[in-house]
């Protein structure tokens, strides 16, 4: 019997196993997960800690038992793959519960081990990272048992911003620090001013160019010389790929430890595939490699791999657009396309508009700031970013579709808006971007 082994059982691994079973009722499918829990909604973790998601069961989407019963897929949690022998088509697995190692064979191997949270190595019982359900349960238990009143959040990526927002809404007073002034790096830095405004409005303290030197009890010592007491520290300081077990195999890794894949999500070894946060691929709209560790790519990868294994070789991955979005209190920040740093690869022009999200006379109108970058040579859109209280997601999604179909900046004047006063304006902000681009 054909045996498919999957490494990792969260977004990428659980989804690809499920998609394969949908098309293939015969193959044996075994999934190894190094952690305790499978198929949890990791994007929900900050919202669960903020009591926005009101039940732990809503975060856990499946268990090994329910997965096997529904799909005839074996999931083995607390089983860490430690090495790959791609010559013999075997892997070595460490069973954390039994404290034993064993080898198992595969015909097809699919790698979705994800990433681990970077740690500041503070050696403190009040310091936590947030990456999985075990982290989440530990933080939730700590908050309840210690009646946490205040918290220090380190880092201004999505985890840092979302956990700060949710701790505040839970009634815990947060302070934010970051090691530089460069925050929320997927956004243009001047468009992040609303992050500072939202914290100022709520008297939330924040400091940039600040780092922790040590923690003694509840006393946090900073590089600036300040010493402040906190009940809880949550670190959101980036991630690293879980690729140590791959390094002694023939599977190619890039210089950061990620796995390059082709448009079928194959590695350089034909019967080994990879998906999720562990991979690098390419952008759809421009000729650049891309690492986009977000949920959409993992789910798209799962579908492509399943179709490939089922024999439909017409299905290929056309690339990322990098659409991303985050809520921070009353504001939404979103972008699509290359990162601000990657813009240096292009001869580009930029056009922006800052106007009411819907008709000015209709109540509740708020400002929406939209910025679009385009290639001067072919006038195709290469990046867009938006910030506002309403309508951000709609505009970024429209621009994502425009980029998917390689529309030029000038064609945005032809975008036909679904207009009524509560929703937009007769000349939407996307139309205005197109009109303004005529002068560029």
UniProtKB/Swiss-Prot annotation:
Cofactor note as given: Binds 1 FAD per subunit.
Entry-linked InterPro entries: CoA_disulphide_reductase, CoA_disulphide_reductase_staph, FAD-bd_OxRdtase, FAD/NAD-bd_sf, FAD/NAD-binding_dom, FAD/NAD-linked_Rdtase_dimer_sf, Pyr_nucl-diS_OxRdtase_dimer
GO molecular function: CoA-disulfide reductase (NADPH) activity; flavin adenine dinucleotide binding; NADP binding; protein disulfide isomerase activity
Keywords per UniProt: FAD, Flavoprotein, NADP, Oxidoreductase, Redox-active center
Subunit organization: Homodimer.
PANTHER family, per the entry: NAD(P)H SULFUR OXIDOREDUCTASE (COA-DEPENDENT), PYRIDINE NUCLEOTIDE-DISULFIDE OXIDOREDUCTASE DOMAIN-CONTAINING
Protein name: Coenzyme A disulfide reductase
Natural source organism: Staphylococcus saprophyticus subsp. saprophyticus (strain ATCC 15305 / DSM 20229 / NCIMB 8711 / NCTC 7292 / S-41)
């Amino acid at each position: 019997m054909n045996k498919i082994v999957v490494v990792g059982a969260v977004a990428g691994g659980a989804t690809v196993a499920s998609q394969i079973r949908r098309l293939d009722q015969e193959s044996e499918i075994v999934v190894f997960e190094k952690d305790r829990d499978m198929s949890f909604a990791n994007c929900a973790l900050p919202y669960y800690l903020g009591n926005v998601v009101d039940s732990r069961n809503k975060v856990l989407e499946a268990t090994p038992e329910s997965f096997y019963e529904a799909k005839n897929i074996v999931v083995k949690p607390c089983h860490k793959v430690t090495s790959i022998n791609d010559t013999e088509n075997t892997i070595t697995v460490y069973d954390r519960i039994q404290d034993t190692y064993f080898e198992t064979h595969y015909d097809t191997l699919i790698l979705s081990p994800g990433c681990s949270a970077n740690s500041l190595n503070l050696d403190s019982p009040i310091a936590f990272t947030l990456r999985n359900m075990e982290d989440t349960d530990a933080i939730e238990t700590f908050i309840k048992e210690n009646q946490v009143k205040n918290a220090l959040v380190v880092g201004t990526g999505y985890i840092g911003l979302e956990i700060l927002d949710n701790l505040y809404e839970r009634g815990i007073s947060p302070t934010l620090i970051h090691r530089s002034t460069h925050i929320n790096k997927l956004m243009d830095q001047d468009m992040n001013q609303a992050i500072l405004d939202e914290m100022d409005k709520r008297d939330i303290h924040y400091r940039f160019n600040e780092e922790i030197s040590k923690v003694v009890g509840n006393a946090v010592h900073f590089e600036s010389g300040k010493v402040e007491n906190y009940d809880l520290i949550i670190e959101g300081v980036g991630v690293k790929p879980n690729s140590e077990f791959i390094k002694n195999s023939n599977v190619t890794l890039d210089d950061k430890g990620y796995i390059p894949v082709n448009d079928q999500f194959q590695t350089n070894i034909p019967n080994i595939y990879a998906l999720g946060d562990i991979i690098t691929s390419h952008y759809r709209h421009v000729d650049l490699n891309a690492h986009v560790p977000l949920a959409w790519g993992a789910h798209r990868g799962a579908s492509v791999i399943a179709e490939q294994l089922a024999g439909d070789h017409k299905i290929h991955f056309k690339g990322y657009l990098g659409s991303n979005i985050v809520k921070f209190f009353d504001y939404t920040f979103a972008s699509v396309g290359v990162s601000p740093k990657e813009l240096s690869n292009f001869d580009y022009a930029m056009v922006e508009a800052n106007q009411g999200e819907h008709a000015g006379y209709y109540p509740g109108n708020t400002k929406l700031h939209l910025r679009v970058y385009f290639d001067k040579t072919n006038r195709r859109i290469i990046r867009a970013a938006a910030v506002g209280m309403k309508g951000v997601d709609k505009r970024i999604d429209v621009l994502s579709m425009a980029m998917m179909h390689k529309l030029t900046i000038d064609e945005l004047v032809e975008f036909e808006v679904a207009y009524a006063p509560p929703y937009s304006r007769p000349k939407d902000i996307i139309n205005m971007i197109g009109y303004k681009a005529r002068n560029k």
